[in-house]
Amino acid sequence: FLGGIPGRDGFYDLNKNHYAHPIENTVIYRFNASLFFANSKLFQEDIENHLKEDTKTVIVDAGTITNIDITAADTLLMLKNNLEKKGIAFYITEHMQGLNTQLRNLGMGSLIEEGCVRRTITAALLDSGLQKPFPLEGVPADLQENLKELQENAEKALSSHKHNTKNIEKIKKTLWLHTLPAEEENTLEEFAWAFGEDTVNEIEKRV
């Protein structure tokens, strides 16, 4: 399960990062294997067992899911429907475009058409209604804003030391500036990623 670190971009394993906090009202689940009949039940149970009363969004980081079979595809659809009944939005993100093709071939194109498939975790969070910096459990909002201001000041400090590599690395380490960029735009590129060879047909349907 993933969360955020105050003042930093990107998403981090909650069990491996002491400073990581869950994003409010959100479950971000990374599944580190292809999804098929033998492990799809575990996948579903892991997510459902981690839900809280205030959970509003579930996001799957499917970056390592390269293949999926019909049983697993059915599980995804069942999970999505179960979550919808509870008022919880469901997203699949971070995977290669080929997985979208597999979903369509298995008759699960509705997941794409209904917006459940997004290119990045950040895009899913923004689509769910959250804004950056994303609110973290147990972290006051004003602290997040203060850290943002601190980063801006740090960037000025970095520019004044641009010829001193040692000072730059020291400032970065002190102020947590090892940030990871995250894509967030809802663009034609993402649309093409989602629909693959069917992109033109899908665009024509919407014109």
Residues covered by each model-derived region:
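The feature marks cytosolic C-terminal regulatory regions of anion transporters and related permeases
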Residues: F1-L106, S110
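STAS-like cytosolic regulatory interaction modules
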Residues: T26, E48-N49, E84-G196, V200-R206
